[in-house]
Swiss-Prot record:
Family, per entry: Belongs to the cytochrome c oxidase subunit 5C family.
Lineage: Eukaryota, Viridiplantae, Streptophyta, Embryophyta, Tracheophyta
Keyword Membrane applies: yes
Protein name: Cytochrome c oxidase subunit 5C-1
Spans traversing the lipid bilayer: 15-34
Main location: mitochondrion
Organism: Helianthus annuus
Keywords, ordered alphabetically: Membrane, Mitochondrion, Mitochondrion inner membrane, Transmembrane, Transmembrane helix
Length: 63
């Protein structure tokens, strides 16, 4: 019987450089999304207080 040699891929450990790059990219992406969310909330708050100052809206319930 001829030898049953099958080419198996050699399993290597995780690449530290690859892990650092992937972690950095994911961290920056998540941070960017968080900053965009924060800026959007700031814009909404600023618009609310601008309308409140102009008298276009009120926080007092009218009877």
């Amino acid at each position: 019987m001829v030898g049953g040699r099958v080419a198996h891929p050699v399993l290597k450990g995780p690449s530290e450089v690859k892990e650092l790059i992937i972690g950095s990219v994911l961290g920056l992406a998540a941070g960017g999304l968080w900053k965009m969310h924060h800026w959007n909330e700031q814009r909404k708050t600023r618009a609310f207080y601008d309308l409140l100052e102009k008298g276009e809206i009120s926080v007092v319930v009218q009877e």
